[in-house]
Each structure stands twice: as C-alpha cells, then as structure tokens.
Amino acid sequence: TVAACNSPKVGLDSDAELVR
C-alpha cells in the first residue's frame, strides 16, 4: 500500500488493504 500513499485515488484501497 506504499503506492496508495502516493496515489490519493488508491487511498481508499489502501485503507481496505490495512484492514485485511
């Protein structure tokens, strides 16, 4: 989810990955 930090569009996805 490191890329999610750089991409705001993937911000929501990063959250879901953290929950997993």
Swiss-Prot record:
This is Kunitz-type serine protease inhibitor SOTI. Belongs to the leguminous Kunitz-type inhibitor family. One of its GO terms (molecular function) is serine-type endopeptidase inhibitor activity. Keywords: Protease inhibitor, Serine protease inhibitor. Stable at pH values ranging from 3.0-11.0 at 4 degrees Celsius. It comes from Spinacia oleracea (Spinach). On the 2D-gel the determined pI of this protein is: 4.05, its MW is: 23 kDa. Inhibitor of bovine trypsin with a Ki of 2.3 uM. Inhibits 50% of the proteolytic activity of P.rapae larvae midgut extract at a concentration of 20 ug/ml. Inhibitory activity against trypsin is reduced by 43% in the presence of the lysine modifier TBNS, but is not affected by dithiothreitol. Thermostable when incubated at pH 8.0 at temperatures between 40 and 100 degrees Celsius.
